Amino acid sequence: MRLMPSLSFPPRFFHRPRRAAIALMALAALAGGAAHARQAAQAEPLPAQIIRLAQQGRTDEALAKAREYLEREPQDVQMRFIQSNLLAQSGRTDEAEAALVQLTRDYPELAEPYNNLAVLHAASGHLEKAREALETALRLDPGYATARENLGDVYLRLAASAYEQAAARPESAGEARQRLTDKAAAIGKLLR
C-alpha cells in the first residue's frame, strides 16, 4: 500500500542546467568530437549531474558525488536535501532520516525536509510522528500541496487504524463490528 508519494526533489531547490551549458553540449555534439562533448558535460552543474545520475538509476554513483561535493560545501542545503533523498531511495532510511532531522535543525524555515521526514516516518508505521512533521511543514508553507495531500493520507491511515482497533475490541459485536470493518476497508481502498 502506498501511503505517500515517493520522495521527490523539490523544484525550488533545483537549478536547471544553464542554457549556455546545454548549448555548449549541443554544439560539441554537432562538431562530432566526443572529447568536446565530455568537456561540455563537465560544464553541467554538479547538482544537475547528480540528479541525472539518480534518474538513470545510478544512485551509488550519485551518492558518491554528493558526498564529494558536501565535503567542499557542507552547508549547501540543496545538496544536503538531494543526498537525503538518495539515501532514502537506496534503502538507507536511518541515514536519510538523520540527514533530514539535521536539515530541520539547520534550516527550520524549510518545509520540504519536514515533508520527506514525514514520508519516512509513515513508511515505518510512525503515523503520529508523520502527522506532526506534516503539520510543521504546513505551518511553514500553507500552500505546500504535496504536504497537504500527504497529511490527508496520514489522517486516512490513522482513521483506518482507529476503526480496525475499535472492531477488534470485545465490546464491538455483530453489526457494529461489521460497520467498523467496512469503514476501515473503504479507507484502505482510498489509499491504494
Q: Language model features by range: what are they?
A:
Residues A43, V77-Q78, A111-E112, A145, ...:
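Helix-start (N-cap) detector for alpha-helical repeat units in TPR-like alpha-solenoids
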Residues P74, Y107-P108, P142, E171:
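Short coil turns that delineate tetratricopeptide repeat
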Residues Q39-E44, L156-R192:
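Terminal, low-structured helical/coil segments at or just beyond the last alpha-helical repeat
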